[in-house]
Amino acid sequence: MSAALLRRGLELLGAPEAPGAAPGHTKPSQAPMKRTRKAKATQAQKLRNSAKGKVPKSALAEFRKKERRGYLGVNLRFMTSARSTVDESVTRQIMRQNRGRKACDRPVTKTKKKKKAEGTVFTEEDFQKFQREYFGS
């Protein structure tokens, strides 16, 4: 069990710390420095194993250099050089068949609402009768 785990367990249980350890004064871990030292040593070993006077190229760096290269021109040349050998009438027929199939190609048909004839349910006689009853004339 590591010292850090043991310390955490003791903190959780609330047991008193060891008498020699001062609170908050822990020695910084040597792991990051050790890791960088080890990485430098392995890199130096790799350089030593190469041919005399030659520096080995990083495969990742080479890939990144080539990755930046644009393939637009190459692709355009390829597309323009490979001409279609299909007859134009066949392509027109295919285009005509495909044109109406998708929903986005179909025009939206708007249904116009029929206007109802604005008329009244009451007749002229009913209005006159109402007027006489309401206004008293």
Curated annotation (Swiss-Prot):
Which region ranges are annotated with the description Disordered?
14-58, 96-120
Give me the stretches of Low complexity compositional bias. Answer: 14-24
Q: Which residues carry this modification: Phosphoserine?
A: S84
In this chain, where does the modification Citrulline occur?
R7
Q: Name one GO cellular component term.
A: cytosol
The UniProt entry's GO biological process terms, in alphabetical order, are: ribosomal small subunit biogenesis
Q: Name one GO molecular function term.
A: enzyme binding
Where is this protein found? Nucleus, Nucleolus
Q: What InterPro entries is this protein classified in?
A: AROS (IPR023262)
Modification after translation (UniProt): Citrullinated by PADI4.
Chief place where the protein resides? nucleus
Its assembly, as annotated, is: Part of the small subunit (SSU) processome, composed of more than 70 proteins and the RNA chaperone small nucleolar RNA (snoRNA) U3. Interacts with RPS19; the interaction is direct and mediates the integration of RPS19 in state post-A1. Interacts with SIRT1.
The record describes the protein's role as:
Part of the small subunit (SSU) processome, first precursor of the small eukaryotic ribosomal subunit. During the assembly of the SSU processome in the nucleolus, many ribosome biogenesis factors, an RNA chaperone and ribosomal proteins associate with the nascent pre-rRNA and work in concert to generate RNA folding, modifications, rearrangements and cleavage as well as targeted degradation of pre-ribosomal RNA by the RNA exosome. Acts as a chaperone that specifically mediates the integration of RPS19 in state post-A1. Direct regulator of SIRT1.
Q: Its family?
A: Belongs to the AROS family.
The name this protein carries in UniProt is Active regulator of SIRT1
Q: Give the organism's phylogenetic lineage.
A: Eukaryota, Metazoa, Chordata, Craniata, Vertebrata
